[in-house]
Amino acid sequence: MAKKDKLERRKKVIDVLNKARAMELLAISQYMNQHYNLDDMDYGELAGKVKLIAIDEMRHAEMFAERVKELGGEPVSEPDGRVTKGQKVDAVFSFDANLEDHTIDTYNQFLLVCRENGDSVSMKLFEAIIDEEQAHYNYFDNVGEHINDLGATYLAKIAGTSSSTGLTPKGFAVTPEGE
């Protein structure tokens, strides 16, 4: 009976880890689509930062997959939804802030599932990733507010900037101040 209970608890944790992985897979595709579009619109600096955030999401997806495998599960490979394409620059950042806010809320719920089922390792994984998702939210919210408040003036300042992310393969959240 105790072994069956442990397996049931483990399955609940694997389920939330896989749901989180599917959310990350969608975020990767969404942010890379936006990266390409922002670069095409000549907002290189914004495109570069969104690409770095997508790289963070790739790392998160891999971390969730590794934990699923450690628990004896099979990592999912399908994203949790479809990419919203063709967004205008003034819509991208509020959209992404909402996506990150939803992710933070959901991951906090998933963290509780891990705690309730006695998996402190997965709980700590969610805590670490939530911290990075908060950094993403702060960036998207800040840029969205600048675009909202300053409009064309803010965007003109960024137009024509380079989208090169240089030799920074680490992502947005693991580099000092997203630089």
What label would you give each PLM region?
Residues 1-179:
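Iron-associated oxidoreductase/ferritin-like identity signal
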